[in-house]
Design a protein with these regions (language model features):
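Mitochondrial intermembrane space
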Residues: 2-11, 19-20, 25-177
Length: 177
């Protein structure tokens, strides 16, 4: 059998053929981005937590049945007074619960939910702080160098934990370490 080759003008068309011949046509599986890996592990942990409570996790883009919505929201995000609070330089106050399935997932992945809450809120609002204080973003980033270092360290830990969670058999990723 004869394989038609591209004309010399389209030599670029030979690169995929050459690559296929050299590698045996096996393509490496794409590596998901760190954000996607952490997001998938968070989802696996929160879904398992909800299921342990007898609740059906909502699917992305779908709302739970109205009768279950309050129960699922409370189980997922926590209830009662918020335990975590941070006032930003803009005056905006960010609050979160430490209880709930999301809090448990963050504790598992980041190792210190309170610290993660603080540094992630700060890092996610650096541009708003720069705008509010009329300072260059580089100056604001420099002022928060320690927070940025903590954020990177905790994200690295979360990626490692997320990989572990996703490589475990179903419903074991929620076990404490």
């Amino acid at each position: 059998m004869r394989i038609p080759l591209p004309s010399p003008r389209s030599a670029a068309g030979l690169l995929p053929l050459l690559g296929c011949l050299l590698t045996g046509c096996s393509a490496a599986a794409p590596v998901p981005a760190p954000d996607e890996t952490i997001k998938a592990a968070t989802r696996a942990l929160t879904d398992a937590c909800l299921m342990r409570q007898g609740l059906t996790p909502p699917h992305p883009g779908e709302s739970p049945p109205p009768t279950d919505e309050q129960q699922i929201t409370a189980a997922l995000f926590g209830k009662g007074p918020t335990e975590l609070s941070l006032t930003l330089p803009t005056g905006y106050v960010v609050r979160a619960h430490t209880d709930g399935c999301l809090g448990a997932a963050q504790q598992r992945l980041y190792g210190d939910q309170r610290r993660w809450f603080r540094v992630s809120v700060i890092v996610n609002n650096l541009e708003a702080e720069a705008s509010h204080t009329h300072r260059p973003l580089s100056e604001v980033r420099d002022r928060h160098r320690a927070d940025l270092a903590d954020w990177h360290r905790m994200r690295t830990r979360a990626l490692s934990e997320a990989t572990t969670v996703l490589n475990q058999p179903p419903f074991q990723g929620d076990m404490p370490r």
